[in-house]
Amino acid sequence: MRVVPLEAFRDKIPFSVAIAAVERGFAALGRGEAELPDPMVLELPAQQAEVHVKGAHLAGGRHIALKVATGFYRNRARGLPSGDGMFLLLDADTGVPAVLLEEHGYLTDFRTAAAVAVTLKYLAPKDAREALLVGAGALEIGRAHV
């Protein structure tokens, strides 16, 4: 299994590529060509934390994608980020782990910003030139691109 650190891909994926990929994924899901089960949520009240595990597979795709995202809300007091995450890509034919992406929430935020852009493409008035995202937090990543 290849381990890919965040530094290897941070700021190297053009936002237009992310938007196109998200749009293709939504279209495949709409056509019934994607598996996207409900997330598993592990709540840890004693730690004021939660762990989310999500999975997806596109019909005919080379990989099964699994995402683990954590929220450990006491971490700020420890000088650590409250959220973290990684993606694990499994070979779709064998189930063998192929790639581990140490994304630390970066791809999650990037994908979410791309999803907002796709949503605006189809739902915003055609003459709209600006959009206001209230409470968008880390989604600011796509601010200049939407």
Regions found by a protein language model. Name each.
Residues 135-137:
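Glycine-rich Rossmann-fold phosphate-binding loop(s) that bind the pyrophosphate
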Residues 130-132:
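Conserved beta-strand elements of the Class I
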Residues 1-108, 115-117, 124-127:
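N-terminal ligand-binding/catalytic initiation module
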Residues 108-109, 140:
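Alpha-helix N-cap/loop-to-helix initiation residues
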Residues 141-146:
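Conserved small/polar residues in nucleotide/adenosyl-binding loops
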